[in-house]
């Protein structure tokens, strides 16, 4: 073998070695980069898991705050007819301390449309007696005292009702406060997937409601609602609700209840909103 050929061979071997070294170095860098990427992804996943937002739900009204609540109820009883009602209520936060919050509320307007057993009844509190038919005038005589009454409602930071007083006193009037903040908050912080239950009794019916956190975003918490009804009526309910985290105000809610009572099947859908004015 000539010296020239030997020199070429050495050069080729040297080049191949350099290429091999370069390939190995490239693989090393690629693997190193991949490992860094995997490590970074794992760290981000771990951070996301530990940094999942948890919130503490409490009522945080301020004295002199004013809120308007709208409640829309649609009731269907199949062939027996149905009813729709829209109500607006204004509430003023009259006092606040560490233990309780006092609200003064007044029903501002009520609109009812009813069709039961072929009998049609319409009532609008914004209309005068002259603008209402005979049935509407009868309903006006029943609702006028309600529109003139003031409801004094005391609640704690968890949303539990401590006391309800109506002036002048009207039986059943306290039921009109039900749509303002019907959620009882848990003691602990909650995050997505958290759930808790509350119980209430209303006119002979016991309602057990389960709230599950569906989402937390932009200062709001979204809840899925499910529940069971027992007592003089039996049934189920489902719905959704949105709560402002900073104030604890239930800004909107939709609840559908299917109820059987005294041989009558009913479907009730209640939609409520509450906003600061």
Predicted regions and their residues:
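Bacterial Sec-dependent N-terminal signal peptides
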Residues: 1-57
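A short, charged
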Residues: 7, 138, 143, 253-262
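Short, aromatic- and cysteine-enriched interfacial helices/patches
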Residues: 23-25, 173, 232
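Acidic, serine/threonine-rich low-complexity disordered tracts
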Residues: 52-121, 194-277
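Mixed-charge, low-complexity intrinsically disordered segments
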Residues: 106, 112-146
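Solvent-exposed helix/loop surface patches that form functional interfaces
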Residues: 141-218
């Amino acid at each position: 073998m000539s010296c020239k050929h030997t020199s070429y061979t050495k050069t080729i071997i040297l080049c191949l070695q350099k290429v091999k070294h370069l390939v190995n170095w490239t693989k090393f860098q690629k693997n190193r980069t991949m490992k860094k990427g995997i490590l970074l992804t794992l760290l981000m996943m771990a951070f996301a898991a530990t940094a999942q937002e948890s919130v503490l739900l409490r009522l945080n009204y301020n004295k002199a705050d004013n809120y308007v609540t709208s409640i829309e109820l649609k009731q269907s009883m199949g062939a027996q007819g149905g009813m729709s009602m829209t109500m607006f209520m204004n509430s003023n936060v009259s006092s606040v301390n560490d233990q309780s919050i006092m609200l003064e509320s007044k029903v501002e307007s009520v609109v009812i449309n009813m069709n039961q057993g072929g009998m049609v009844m319409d009532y609008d509190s914004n209309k005068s007696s002259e603008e209402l038919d005979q049935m509407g005038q009868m309903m006006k005589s029943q609702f006028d005292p309600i529109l003139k009454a003031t409801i004094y409602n005391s609640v704690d930071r968890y949303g539990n009702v401590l006391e309800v007083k109506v002036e002048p006193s009207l039986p059943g009037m306290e039921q009109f406060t039900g749509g303002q903040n019907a959620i009882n908050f848990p003691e602990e912080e909650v995050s997505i997937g958290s759930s808790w239950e509350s119980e209430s009794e209303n006119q002979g019916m016991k309602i057990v409601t389960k709230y599950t956190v569906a989402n937390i975003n932009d200062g709001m918490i979204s809840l899925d609602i499910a529940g069971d009804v027992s007592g003089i009526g039996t049934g189920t309910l489902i719905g959704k609700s949105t709560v402002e985290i900073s104030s604890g105000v239930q800004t909107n809610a939709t609840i559908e209840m299917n109820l059987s009572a005294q041989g009558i099947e009913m479907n009730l859908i209640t939609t409520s909103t509450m906003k600061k004015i």
